[in-house]
Amino acid sequence: MAFTPSSPPSPAADASQRPSRYPGEDTTPTSRREILGWYAYGIAAEVFAVCGVGSFLPLTLEQLARERGVLKSSHLPCVGPDAPTSSLANGTAPALLRRDGADNDQCVVGLLGLEINTASFAMYTFSLAVLVQALTLISFSALADYENNRKTLLLAFGFIGSATSMLFVFVAPPVFTFGAILVIIGVTCLGSSFVVLNSFLPVLVANDPSIQGASKEADEELHTLNENGQFEPRDSFSERNPEFESQYTPGIGLGSKPSTNATSPELQLSTRISSKGVGLGYCAAVLVQILSIGLLFALSKTSLPKVSGTLPLRFVLLLVGIWWFSFTMVTRRWLRNRPGPPLSTTTTGGHTNKWRVWLRLVGFAWKSLWKTVKIAVQLREVRVFLVAWFLLSDAIATVSGTAILFARTELKMSTTLVGCLSITATLSGMTGAFLWPVVSRRFKLKSSHTIMLCIALFEIIPLYGMLAYIPLFKKWGVIGLQQPWEIFPLAIVHGIVSGGLSSYCRSFFGLLIPPGSEAAFYALYAATDKGSSVIGPAIVGMLIDATGQVRSGFFFIAILIVLPIPLVWMVNAEKGRMEGVAMAERMAKGQESETGEPGEEAEGLLARGA
C-alpha cells in the first residue's frame, strides 16, 4: 500500500525542528491538523469496539446460529414457520423483537460434528478472536517502529477491520461460520490498530512546537499546560499530583534510562491528548449507538425482520463499518507518515531480504516478552499483581459478553433494548473514570483499596443473577435478573466499576515497575490482559452447553471476580517499589553489553496499547 508523501516543511518550520535521531526521521512540527487526524482514528475504531464488539456482534452471531439451529429435544427448527414458538405471535412478531425457541429447551447448531448452544457459539468465537488478537499484537508490535510501517499498518488494520464489519451484510444464516471468521479478523484488526495508533503519540508529542519551546529552557521551572493547551512555568506540580511520578512514559524500553522528570511537559501533553482522544471516541460510540437504535426501530416496522432476524443487525454493522472506514480515510489524509528508523537489510543476489528482517523482528518481540517475564517472576509484588490482573481482566471481558447474550436469550430483550443497555454501560463507564478519583480522595483510599472496593461492587452482578435460583425469588418472578428492567441498574454498576478498574489497576502496576523498564512491563501487562480474556468466555460457553442456560455462567463469574481480592490485598506497593529500584540497578550493571540491538525500541510498542 503506497501513500503520498507529505509536503516538505517550510523554512519557518525548519527553524523550530529538533535534530533527527536517525536517517529519514520526519521532525516536522506537529500541526493541529495532524492531531485531528490522530483523533479521527479513535473516533473511527471506538465505534466498532462499543457498537460492534460490545453490543451487536454477539447478538448477530447468536441469531445467525439460531436461524440454522434446532431444538435439542425435538430437532425442530428454532426459527421459522415450523418452530414451536411461531404460533405464539400468529406469525406477526418479528424475530428481531423476541427470543425464538422454547423456554425450557436449548437451541443447538451443528459445528465440526458437535452440537453446541447458539449462545456458546458466540462465546467460543470471541474467545478465539481474543487469542488471535493477542498473538498478533505481540508479533506485529516490533514491525511498526520501522520505516513507513507505522502508518501502513494502521491504515491496513483500519481498512480490513471496517471491511469485515461491512461484509456482515452478506452473511446469511446458511454461512453463519463465515460470520465467526469475520469477527476474528475484525477483533484482531481493532486491537492491533489501537496499539499502532498509540505508538504515534510519543512521536506527535516530541515534535509539538510547545514541547520544542519548553525543551530549550533547561534548568527552569517545570512547564504545565494552561487552559489553552500551551505550556507555561508552574511550581511544584509534583507536589500537587505526586502519582504522576509513577505514570508510564511512552517510548521507554527495557533497560532504558529512567526519566529524571516524570512530570515533564511531554508526559503532560501526552496525557492531555490521550484523554481527549478517549473521550471523543466514546462520544462517537454513543452517537452511533443512538443512530443504530433508531435504525433498528425503523427497520422493525418493515418486512425485513420477517425475512431474517439478523438483517436489521447486519445493516447496523454495515453502518458501523462505513463509519470506521470513513474516519480512517480522514486519518489517512491528515496524519503524517512519521517513519521510523530504516531496517538494516542484507542483500543476496541483488535482492533485499526484508522478509527475513521482519521475521527476525517478530522473533525479537517474543524474545523481549519472555525476557520481561523472567524478570517479573523475580519480583514478588509484580508476580502477585499480574496474577490478580490476569483473573480480573478475564472477569471483566467475560461479564461483558455474557451480559449481552443473557439479555437477549434469557430475558428475551429486543435488540433495541440491548442497544440501550450498551449505551447505559458506556455512559456509566465514562462517569466512573471521573468518579473514582473523587471517591478515593474523599475517603483517603489507597490505590489498592480502591481496586478492592471496585471488585467488591463488581461481585454484585453475578451474585444478584444467582438469586433467581432461590425458590422464593423464582416464585415471585422478580429479583435475580428475571425481569428485563433489572439488568439496567447492574449495567450502571458494571460501567462505573470498569471505569475505575481500568485506570487504577494500570497506575497501581506502574508503582511496581523497575525504573527504565516501563514499556517492557506494560507490554507484559497488555499481553496478560489479552491472554486471560481467552479463558473466561470459553468456560462460560462450556457451561451453557452443559446446562442450556446462560445464567449458569454466573457461578463461574462469581468465583472469578472474587479471587483477585486477596491477591491485591497481599501486594505491598512500597515494598514493590523498592524491589523495582533494586532490580533496575542490577539490570543497569549488565546492560552495557546489550545496547545497540536492532529491536531496542520495538519493545515499547505493545505497551502503548495497554
From Swiss-Prot:
Primary localization class, coarse: membrane
Pfam families named among the record's database cross-references: ATG22
Matches recorded under SUPFAM superfamilies: MFS general substrate transporter
Topology in the lipid bilayer: Multi-pass membrane protein
Entry keyword NAD: no
Disulphides: none
Record-level GO BP terms: amino acid transmembrane export from vacuole; autophagy
InterPro entries given in the database record: Atg22, Atg22-like, ATG22/LtaA_families, MFS_trans_sf
UniProt protein name: Autophagy-related protein 22-1
Sites carrying sugar chains: 90, 261
Residue intervals passing through the bilayer: 35-55, 120-140, 152-171, 189-209, 278-298, 310-330, 384-404, 418-438, 453-473, 488-510, 522-544, 553-573
Compositionally skewed regions (Pro residues) per UniProt: 1-11
Biased composition (Acidic residues): 594-603
Region Disordered, residue ranges: 1-29, 229-265, 588-610
Name of the encoding gene: atg22-1
Gene3D superfamilies: MFS general substrate transporter like domains
Sorted UniProt keywords: Amino-acid transport, Autophagy, Glycoprotein, Membrane, Transmembrane, Transmembrane helix, Transport, Vacuole
Family: Belongs to the ATG22 family.
